[in-house]
Amino acid sequence: MNRGNVGGGLIVGGGRGKTTQMASFLCEGGQIVPTDQPPCPVRTRPAIVYRDCLSRGTVQKADPLDVQRDIEELHKAFKSADDNVITDILSRRTNDQRQVIAKAYQEKYNTNLHEELKVDLSEQYRKAVSGLLEDPFIFLAKHVRHTLKSSALTHKDVALLEILYPLEPQEVDAIVQAYREEYDHNLEEEIEKEMSGVFKGILVRLVTGKRSTHRKVDVPQRNKDLEYLRNNTEERLQSADDNVIFRFLVLLKSVYNRTGFYADQLHMAIKDISSGSEDRLMRIVISRSEIDLENIKDFFQSAYSHTLTDFVYDDTSGDYRNLLLRLVGM
């Protein structure tokens, strides 16, 4: 099988044997980073260090932040189901600032902001606003939970890898902890119980921290990866259907180019009418909006000759569309 370019970036091909060789880096999370690049300055978002020193988010901190004005405007907006005001405020605040607003709202009105979302708003819009109000790792933990428990997904292992594998090890650890706190269950045990498929073993290694955090690829690590692949994955990859193989190749792109991977994921989510595509679109836009969504937009336009804004506008509607467009940055 030869798919050629995936999203105009990583070139993959050469049949299933070549696929399994490329997969060697995925097995233990080896990251390929040019050795001649200077180290990136440390950037944190709750205690997470990111790989990309030139990452640019679309959502910036509001300065100054007028918390009292925000909660009063939100209170009136929820009473009248004014989605324009809700969107205008929450899409222009960082997650940390939204947490401050939510706490102040609770203290003043004795009501949780999530409860206020029960007003006459569309379902997708409510889900998106609720996601904005969540702690970032609880938000992703809920998407992990939905993937695990979904009866509509045919390849849960690949869908779950698409959420977890591109993240930093510290982020995965934070999601595992958030999952435990939110659902009182161990994510490793849940994967063992709920999952099947080609990549179940890789998922278990991922959530238990048994992945390399080294950025440079060396021969011993490569050989170790290949040995793990031969023993655990290669035979099952040979019998996997083309859809799984193609999605796996797209996933491999996150090893080389995380920005390109997310651009491809957004393109697939917008073009795909299958179950879960809308959630994928929402998850990526919200979770990357403060990190590198501006970079993803640039790559998207380069790869697909259209802006992400145009794609979102054409594929969504109403209050949900307006919120996503604000987050994407019109």
Regions found by a protein language model. Give the residues of each.
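Structural signature for extended repeat/solenoid scaffolds and their inter-repeat hinge/linker regions
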Residues: N2-M330
